[in-house]
Amino acid sequence: MLRKVSMMVAVSAAAFVMATGIAAAQDTLKIGASAPKTGPLAGGAAVTHWPNIKLWVEEVNKRGGLKVGNKQMKVELIEYDDKTTADEAIKNITRLATVDKVDFIVTPYSTGINVATAPLIAKFGYPHITTSAATDSVPEFAKRWQNSFWLLGTSKQLAEGVADALKKLRDSGAIGKRVALVNVADAFGLELKNAGKPALEKAGFEIVYEASYPLGTQDVAPIISAAKAANPDAFVAFSYPPDTFALTEQAQIQKFDVGAFYVGVGTAFPAFAGRFKDNANGVMGVGGINASAPEMQDYLKRHKEVTGAVPDAWASATTYAGLEILGQAIERAGTTDKAKVIAEIRKGPFKTVIGEVNLKDGINHNVWAVGQWQDGTFNGVASSGLSGAKAPVKKQPWK
Amino acid sequence: METIVTGVLLGGTYALIAIGLTLQYGVARIMNLANGETFVAACFIAFWLFTSYAINPLWGILVIAPVAFLVNWAIYALLLRPLVDRAKSQGMLEVDSILATFGLLFLFQGLMLRGFGGAYTSYTFLAERFDIFGTFYGLNRVVAFGAACVIAVLLYLFLYRTRYGTAVRAVAVNPNSAKLVGIDVAKAAALSFALGGALTACGGTLLSTFYTFNASMGVIFTMKALIIVIMGGVGDVRGAVIAALILGIAETAVARLVDPGLTLAATYALFVFVLLFRPQGIFGRQQA
């Protein structure tokens, strides 16, 4: 028995030596990704998250890999499905760090899972560049986990952008001051409503209808008819993709015409314009890009070529930018040492598809808050600290 | 008035979700947890037919329903029949079939992910205004409601006015006694399961015209169907339709008159209420 055990120890020790031996000689950079392929958020990740990882890895490898010190390292991607649960994400990241021994990891998808996995990622010491997390706790998180970087902004920025865009429309005489405000009853919807309502009131708007609905609601006819009965000038919904689509279709069916129509996540998806065609024109939503910037146009073209699909006009480009930052920081550090790469990310600045990004305090302060469909492009119309915003236009009646 | 019409339309939608499971659970005695996946698969096929071949989803049903019938027949014959044969009691069959269809759920989900990806999918079909008493409703919802009525009536006529339908009902009430009067229980159960699958697929096709769906949404539909089936009384089509209408109207009334945030609370309150006062369901029979 004793012999058997010592034999096993010897074998595993040998295996360990071999494994580390290979690791030392490797010319590939292992990057791990854990995000939803199934579960409630798989739909969003399939548009925003996975295609950009694919694009970045393909492009890096096509140009021969990353230049780390005096080595050219090709990227090898290891992907796991987190089934949209934090438990699974934690298992995946532990596995990536301890079994696959990846050099770096790609951020998980969504606010909830990023926050849930942040302590673990901090423990393993990986740089954690989040590109799909928007919450008001960003400043606190960035301080707590010094390895974490937050690119998508805060709920407050996103919600105040709405007040900002509506104010511009009111000042131009396009709309009055009556606003109907609805939100999906989960963390995202509530945070945006809690920040958006005071911002709207401060900007002199009057909330004439306010309601929330459970996550997953697609039968929104009563919500639209109640909002319509309140006779508002603007409709604002902090919604998720299925309800974003349902609210827009119902508004169109019930001829609920307002001068400003804002719906949440999903508005920036190419599928939104694809489905509503001319009726998408003038609809506002979360996000936005500076579609006329040359680096953005180039990105849109490459994304289409490599993944076969047009990216969404919000977090897609941010997700890609997060990977660009990781790549550039590794090259600048000239090593795969995680702490050195983190220090390099803090140093900044980085040239990315969303413009120049600085992450001195771990936060990207310049973000798009509101975009609007204008003749087939989802242009940013309200932002914090970014130039290139188009003026919001009045929503014409539904066809 | 507007609330009632909206509620009735929603009830039609719910009836479409639940009617297939009523047959599968009530007659074939299979608690099919993969019911929602069948539903979503039909949504995807309708979407694919519509976008690739410009086939109107209403015609699409003519393709989708028979295919679903055959697939479900095969599932029953190959996967579930052995469970039925070895089950010593009703309870054992229920546990076994739940486990088996739970596995099936993941298989279907995986296949759909492979085939269609995980993204949200939707298309526009008949998203036109339809005027009822001066208020506009989505034509696609009205059409789905109409189809739900037609399906429910045909099913009712089949079950209550034909000889074979009577046999199917006999199996639903008591499989052992049905054998004694010369009914081929195995065949009746297989037929009910396959028919249930076909009806679920019809529902999916119709709902795809106004719902946004993705490969992992099946469980939402299974949950809703389950609530309706249990409220209506297991195996009773009339009960399922009435339960669906009650839920539809209640949810709409709560959303319109109280608060849209309370629709789920209303659903479960009604569910608890029915379970407390009529545990066998609205039309269910007291177990002997």
Region locations from a protein language model:
Chain B
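Cytosolic-side transmembrane-helix boundaries in multi-pass membrane proteins
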Residues: 179-180, 184-187, 258-288
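Membrane-interfacial amphipathic/re-entrant helices at transmembrane-helix boundaries
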Residues: 1-17, 45, 56-60, 87-96, ...
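Transmembrane helix-bundle core of multi-pass membrane transporters
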Residues: 83, 92-161, 188, 253, ...
